[in-house]
Amino acid sequence: HTDSSAASDVYKRQLFALSNIGRDKLSAIEFDLEKGAETKVLFEHKEVDLDSVHFSRKRKVVSDCLFTTWKSERVYFDEEAKGIYEYLESQLPDCNVVLESMNVDENKFTVRTYSDRSLGAYYYFDATTQQLSLLANVSPWLNESELAHTRPIKYLSRDGHTIHGYLTQPPGKEKNLPVVVNPHGGPWHRDVWGFNPEVQFLANRGY
């Protein structure tokens, strides 16, 4: 299996992709197009599949890999990409940060954020000046202070397997609450951390 977000370095005849051939999780690999074979594992996570591998066309390097534990995380191979994300995350705390698009010089970006209490916002970011400007709020009608936080939990099943999930509690209430279990589809699917209107409605009603 290879991922559709794979990138190639046509000058070196290499393909950077995700593969689970010979392993039970999607990992970032380097593939030699002339040999028709995988030549290197760039990164693999011991618990989860990788979501994507990203390539800088300007610098001709693999910049980072994205994966989801309880929330989206990255491992970096490129200091410039790492610096951009770390700066944005310092300016936009308590949310996931995504680079939606960029210019050819890879120094001007459209940035998307989201969290467990908001559908997020779009920003314009100029990396040369570190200017970050709000373009639009996706859900300006939501008052985050009135909404519930979602946090990760895990527990052991009867047969000894670790089950991961999320717990959302009404603000200011922690004990003796009625519980609604909201399972995801699948079995290949999983829930992710972010804004869920159904969950927020139930938390607002005291569940």
Language model segments and positions:
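Single conserved hydrophobic/aromatic residue that forms the stacking wall/gate
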Residues: H1-A7, Y11
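Surface loop/turn motifs at the tips and blade-to-blade linkers of beta-strand repeat domains
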Residues: L42-K46, L92
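Serine-hydrolase catalytic core recognition
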Residues: V98-Y207
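Short loop/turn segments that connect beta-strands within beta-propeller blades
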Residues: D32-G36, A127-T128
